[in-house]
Design a protein with these regions (language model features):
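Intrinsic disorder/low-complexity signature
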Residues: 2, 21-24, 38
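Folded, non-transmembrane soluble domains that reside on the lumenal/extracytoplasmic side of membranes
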Residues: 26-187
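Bacterial N-terminal signal peptides
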Residues: 13-22
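Bacterial N-terminal signal peptides that target proteins for export
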Residues: 2-12
Length: 188
């Protein structure tokens, strides 16, 4: 009987421990890559045309260079900082060629109203922090401020795609230039 009581206590304590662990862990779960990999539109912000464009141009980019530009939209960051969330996504998705570390992540959190670009070390030469900030300010942020997420993300993606293509001295099939060039001061 004494052994049975100890066993019950161990089972109850274990159940409590794993419940707490599971509940805390669920606050920090991040999304998994979709079957399309390059487009992970969990916040439903992108048009089918934009998704198709990102998929087609990425396939060409990856085939020619091994580089990958992954777009992820989420409803919110589930309590994480955008830097932490983007870093974890970048690592877990395995973006870019493993040896060249030439991946690029464009992350948009709809409810948090935040956008982040995560650059692999292999692309930091052509996309240093200052340049990624300027590209966001010029091609993405003005649209996001106006709730034009599809346009902003597509324009930003096109701008980053152009920079990566230029770095590798290649032409991307079906590549379109950003539709409108706007500075962030026009929306202040």
């Amino acid at each position: 009987m004494l052994l049975l009581n100890k066993l019950k206590k161990v089972i109850i304590c274990s159940a409590i421990f794993f419940s707490i662990l599971f509940l805390n862990g669920s606050n920090y779960a991040i999304v998994s890559p979709t079957k399309d990999f390059y487009v992970n539109d969990y916040a439903n912000l992108l048009s089918e045309e934009t998704k198709k464009y990102i998929l087609q141009t990425n396939q060409d980019l990856n085939q020619k260079t091994g580089a990958q530009i992954v777009v992820v939209t989420v409803k919110n960051l589930e309590g994480k900082s955008i830097e932490e969330y983007a870093n974890q996504l970048f690592r877990e998705f395995g973006i870019g060629d493993k040896e060249k570390n030439n991946g690029l992540l464009l992350l948009c959190s709809y409810e948090d109203r935040m956008f982040r670009v995560e650059v692999g070390y292999g692309l930091e030469g052509c996309l240093p922090d200052g340049k990624t900030g300027r590209l966001q300010d010029e091609y993405i942020i003005p649209y996001l401020r106006e709730n034009k997420f599809d346009e902003g993300i597509r324009n930003g993606y096109s701008a980053f795609l152009g920079e990566v293509a230029e770095e590798y001295n290649i032409t991307i099939d079906r590549r379109e230039e950003a539709t409108i060039k706007i500075t962030s001061t026009q929306f202040v």
